[in-house]
């Protein structure tokens, strides 16, 4: 089934995805517990955020109008992008690839699980409106299950792994401390497997992958796995939810190299 789904996603056509949904629904599998969107629940906020690490200073990155960038991987990038596009303070969320080389950053190669890439989303945000720690809270509670190794929902493979690609030492510290905090509190039944890795390059995905959750709300996959995540963001974090998504549109996604 994963092979069929991956092939349909490669076509990225809503009619193909609808066909898969119809076929799988007919067998009683598509909306079964094993294939439903990951369960979301409130978790403790990070005890340490960027502000605590920079206490007593006024770094330029937190000045009014400043921007920061972070990269998140947590399963299919359609849903990850969709949630962050509905998060207040996010300026742009771009689907793409991280963890491998530029020459293999193509969907047909990434899906072979031989490139080292993870489907990822580059999030540019205003730290005066939303902090990195608050984005992590959404990531760990709404976007995916961080205890699943190399899979989310029906998608299996290392390119669907849970990973945080940090752009500076502060992000690394906040991410590692938060994971340790959640593990110590036994928030999940199993230990978190999220990788915390330096960002060596982010490569935007093909145009047909951008804004996918918004452009294809009738897709069987989006209905089953991604719209529930956006709904959970609205319910669980109403102060962070934005009804109008911040779409990539015709803007050119930029290549990030720390």
Regions found by a protein language model. Give the residues of each.
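Flexible coil/turn and secondary-structure edge motifs
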Residues: 2-258
């Amino acid at each position: 089934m994963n092979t069929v789904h991956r092939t349909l996603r490669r076509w990225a056509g809503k009619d193909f995805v609808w066909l898969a949904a119809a076929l799988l629904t007919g067998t009683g599998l598509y909306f079964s517990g094993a294939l439903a969107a990951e369960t979301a629940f409130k978790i403790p906020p990070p005890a340490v955020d960027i502000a605590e690490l920079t206490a007593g200073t006024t770094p330029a990155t937190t000045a009014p109008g400043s921007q920061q960038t972070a990269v998140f991987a947590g399963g299919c990038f359609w849903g990850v992008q969709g949630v962050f596009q509905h998060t207040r303070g996010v300026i742009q969320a771009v689907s793409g690839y991280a963890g491998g080389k530029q020459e293999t950053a193509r969907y047909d190669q990434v899906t072979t699980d031989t490139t080292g890439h993870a489907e990822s989303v580059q999030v540019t945000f205003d730290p005066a409106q939303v902090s990195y720690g608050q984005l992590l809270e959404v990531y760990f509670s709404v976007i995916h299950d961080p205890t699943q190794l190399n899979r989310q929902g029906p998608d299996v493979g290392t390119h669907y792994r849970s990973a945080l690609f940090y752009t500076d030492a502060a992000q690394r510290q906040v991410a590692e401390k938060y994971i340790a905090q959640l593990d110590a509190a036994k928030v999940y039944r199993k230990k978190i497997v999220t990788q915390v890795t330096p960002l060596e390059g982010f490569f935007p995905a093909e145009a047909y992958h951008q804004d996918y959750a918004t452009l294809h709300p009738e897709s069987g996959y989006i209905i089953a796995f991604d719209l529930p995540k956006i709904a959970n963001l609205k319910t669980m974090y109403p102060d962070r939810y934005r009804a109008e998504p911040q779409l990539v549109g015709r803007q050119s996604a930029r290549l990030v190299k720390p």
